[in-house]
Amino acid sequence: IIRCVKDAQIETETIILEPIASGLSCLNQTQKEEGVLLLDIGGGTSDMVIFYEGNPVFTKVIPIGGKTITRDIATTCNISYEMAETLKTQCGTCIVEKSNKDHHINFPVSGGDSRQISEPYLAEIIFCRINQMLQFVQQTLQKSKYANIVKSVVITGGGAQLKHLEELCR
C-alpha cells in the first residue's frame, strides 16, 4: 500500500491500522483513558482493539465478520448470498428467544418458486456464528494481560446492526 501511494506521488503523514482508526473516531477520551474494548464487526473480519491511558495497547483480527454469517445462512438454507443477506438484515436476530416461534419467513427462490424458514431457525444460524465470535473475543481478552483494565465495550461496524446484539453481549 505504501509503495502504491508513493508511486501515485502522494505524501503520507502516517499509517493507522483500521481498528485503531475506528477507535479514534468512535471513542471519547474518557473511554480511551479508563480502558475500553472496541469490537468492530466488519464484512470479512472483525477487529478488536483495547485502549488504555489514551492509547491503543492491544489489537487482534478475528476471522469472522458479517459476510461469514451471510454465507452460513446461504449455505444452511441453500439460497443465494443476496437473499441470505436480505434475510439477515431484515428478519434476523442474535437471540433465538427473541424470535417469533410462530412466524415463518417466505422468500422467492429461482424458478419463480418460494420457500420459507422459521424465524427461530434463522436466529439459530446467526446466533451460532455470533456466539463463536464473542467466545473468541472473550478468550482472547482473558489470555491477554489487559482483561482487568477493560471497563466498557463498544461495538461498531456493519455487523453491529444485528438485532439484539447488545443484549446478547451483556
Predicted regions and their residues:
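Residue-level detector of high-confidence beta-strand sites
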Residues: 59-61
